[in-house]
């Protein structure tokens, strides 16, 4: 006997799962109208869909930065396309897991996945969202930091920074975070640059100078100048302050009686090999296949 599924049942299932209308109707028919069984089955199928999509490259997404008192969080949540990175459901999930991680001071993705999320776990919520949206979604990395004066800045959801200062005020820590986002220093001070990094850069600069045909003595002087510039470029305190290039960050901090202890800077997709789609070739291949 065929099971009749009402519009009210479909709506209730949609409200509870956020899945598509046809998926809800199909699940209710298969569960013979049992709402709870339909939800259970959809979660199972959602997990299967999520597993199938797990191997796909997720290099787009959003960076989130949150500060609560003396604790701050910086996180990256990835998806496959920039379109989904702007999706309300994706952003709601990303913001909620950031709040959960901050509240529990969790900096491990594995530990976060086990925490509660609307009656389920974060991992189940992620799998359900993969099923709904149709893209691989991953919580890539989390950082929890504690400090006296924490600053947070996110630029267009793509670059995020947490700055940790001793002294100064909230405006200063935010300005430092904003500067780090824009100037991308790698170290706090010039003396923090590791010796092997300096040696490698010197080797590169010397090779460039020699290749240009300069005499060795002149090449050495050129390299010395370039190395001084290199240390200034990669260290925060040696950089011109982004909001007032007439002063260095070091002077800004000194005048405020403050010190930068550390900073963390994340950029969406950094270090991930993105697949470059050749849509023209894809269309040509599809047309060639259909012509056979």
From Swiss-Prot:
MF terms per GO, please? translation elongation factor activity
- Spans annotated as Involved in Mg(2+) ion dislocation from EF-Tu: 81-84
Q: Which UniProt keywords apply?
A: Cytoplasm, Elongation factor, Protein biosynthesis
Q: GO CC: one term? A: cytoplasm
Subcellular location(s) of the protein: Cytoplasm
What is this protein's function? Associates with the EF-Tu.GDP complex and induces the exchange of GDP to GTP. It remains bound to the aminoacyl-tRNA.EF-Tu.GTP complex up to the GTP hydrolysis stage on the ribosome.
Family of the protein in this entry: Belongs to the EF-Ts family.
Identify this protein by name: Elongation factor Ts
């Amino acid at each position: 006997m065929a099971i009749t599924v009402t519009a009210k049942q479909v709506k209730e299932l949609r409200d509870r799962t956020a899945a598509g209308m046809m998926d809800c109707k199909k699940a209710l028919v298969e569960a013979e109208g049992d709402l709870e069984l339909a939800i259970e089955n959809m979660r199972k199928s959602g997990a299967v869909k999520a597993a199938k999509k797990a191997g796909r490259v997720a290099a787009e997404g959003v960076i989130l930065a949150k500060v609560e008192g003396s604790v701050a969080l910086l996180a990256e949540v990835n998806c496959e396309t920039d379109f989904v990175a702007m999706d309300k459901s994706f952003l709601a999930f990303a913001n909620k897991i950031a709040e959960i991680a901050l509240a529990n001071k969790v900096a491990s993705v594995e530990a976060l996945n086990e925490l509660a999320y609307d009656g389920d776990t974060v991992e189940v919520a992620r799998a359900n969202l993969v099923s709904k949206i149709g893209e691989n979604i991953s919580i890539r990395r989390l950082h929890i930091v504690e400090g006296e004066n924490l600053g947070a800045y996110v630029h267009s959801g793509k670059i995020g920074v947490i700055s940790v200062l001793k002294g100064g005020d909230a405006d200063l820590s935010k300005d430092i975070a904003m500067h780090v986002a824009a100037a991308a220093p790698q170290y706090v001070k010039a003396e923090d640059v590791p010796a092997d990094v300096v040696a490698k850069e010197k080797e590169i600069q010397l090779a460039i100078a020699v290749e240009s045909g300069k005499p060795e003595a002149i090449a050495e002087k050129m390299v010395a100048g370039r190395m001084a510039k290199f240390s200034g470029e990669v260290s925060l305190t040696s950089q011109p302050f982004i909001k007032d290039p007439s002063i260095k960050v070091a002077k800004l901090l000194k005048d405020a009686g403050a010190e930068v202890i550390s900073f963390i800077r994340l950029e969406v997709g950094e270090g991930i090999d993105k697949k470059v789609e050749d849509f023209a070739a894809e269309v040509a291949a599809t047309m060639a296949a259909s012509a056979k």
